[in-house]
Swiss-Prot record:
This is 33 kDa chaperonin. Its main location: cytoplasm. The keyword Zinc applies. Under oxidizing conditions two disulfide bonds are formed involving the reactive cysteines. Under reducing conditions zinc is bound to the reactive cysteines and the protein is inactive. GO terms for cellular component: cytoplasm. The gene is hslO. Redox regulated molecular chaperone. Protects both thermally unfolding and oxidatively damaged proteins from irreversible aggregation. Plays an important role in the bacterial defense system toward oxidative stress. One of its GO terms (biological process) is protein refolding. Keywords: Chaperone, Cytoplasm, Disulfide bond, Redox-active center, Zinc. It is found in: Cytoplasm. Disulfide bonds join 230-232, 263-266.
Length: 294
């Protein structure tokens, strides 16, 4: 495998069919996620496929902000979250309880789970958009295809794969009529679905496109680099504590001596002592908490 293909997004367009597509392979970015928490094997598959899918779905958005995919389950897998920003940075985390390995995805998620897609602008959080649908399908790819069809009315084909070394995916999406012959979509997506997981994980974008679509007219765009990045910061944690309120923070300080927050995505620790809290709220929060108890 050529290192040039590592952590790369490749967008492409068909000249003779109403289809646009993208291929992504995550190596270093995926390893950064795995290095931060010991995920069970079954959860690695889900999280890796979601990570690849988030980059593919964000690839066609003209949008300054982040696309967030969430799967909420009621079984052993409680939550899987992936965020991809328009600068092609990604992060991911998950919560689970109990044994996950050896069970199909539906069993891991339990009954009544839901899929949430959020578009969060970087500057104006009031313009955040969210779509929520029931989980339908036996794989992350099927669930996302169903979401796109129900929520966006977009025919989509997703092939996703995740292993210990890399996570990868290909997205094909039908464009409105007028972008080539109508039956072009059926032909292209059928070809696309012949792509195997080991090919996705083992071949570069150029080889995959040639193998699948050598009889089609494919226009490729410049490759883009994808990387892991967590945008947590002490300032953001401070804002969160401010929203919690001085009384709550004072109570924790009274009981534990400090407030410690650990980022779910990157495991960065943020510790706030009494002096930090007093600066944050502009009054003695511990004295106030002590007084409230008497």
């Amino acid at each position: 495998m050529n290192m040039n293909h590592h952590d790369k997004l490749q967008r492409f367009l068909f000249d003779g069919a109403p289809v646009r597509g993208a291929l992504v392979r995550l190596d270093g970015a995926w390893q950064q996620v795995l290095a931060r928490r010991a995920y069970p094997q079954a959860l690695k598959t889900v999280l890796g496929e979601m990570m690849a899918a988030s980059v593919l779905m964000a690839a066609n958005l003209k949008f300054d902000g982040s696309l967030i995919l969430q799967i909420h389950g009621t079984g052993a897998l409680k939550l899987a979250v992936v965020e991809c920003n328009n600068d092609r940075t990604v992060r991911a985390t998950a919560k689970w309880d109990g044994d996950l390995d050896g069970k199909p995805l539906k069993a891991l998620l339990g009954e009544g789970g839901k899929f949430v897609l959020t578009l969060e602008p970087r500057l104006d959080k009031n313009q955040t958009w969210q779509g929520i649908v029931a989980l339908e399908g036996d794989s992350v790819g099927q669930m996302l295809e169903n979401y796109m069809l129900r929520s966006e009315q977009l025919d989509t084909a997703l092939v996703l794969a995740s292993g210990d070394e890399a996570a990868a995916g290909m997205l094909l999406q039908r464009l409105p009529e007028g972008h080539g012959e109508a039956e072009g979509w059926d032909r292209v997506q059928m070809l696309g679905r012949t792509l195997k997981a080991e090919e996705l994980l083992g071949l570069g974008a150029e080889d995959i496109l040639h193998r699948l679509f050598h009889e089609e007219q494919v226009r490729v765009f410049e490759q883009e680099t994808v990387s892991f990045n967590c945008n947590c910061s002490r300032e953001r944690v401070s804002n969160m504590l401010t929203m919690l309120g001085g009384q709550e923070v004072g109570d924790v300080l009274l009981e534990q001596g400090s407030v410690e927050i650990v980022c779910d995505y990157c495991n960065q620790r943020y510790v706030f002592d009494e002096e930090d809290a007093n600066q944050l709220f502009d009054y003695d929060v511990v004295a106030a908490a002590r007084e409230a108890r008497h």
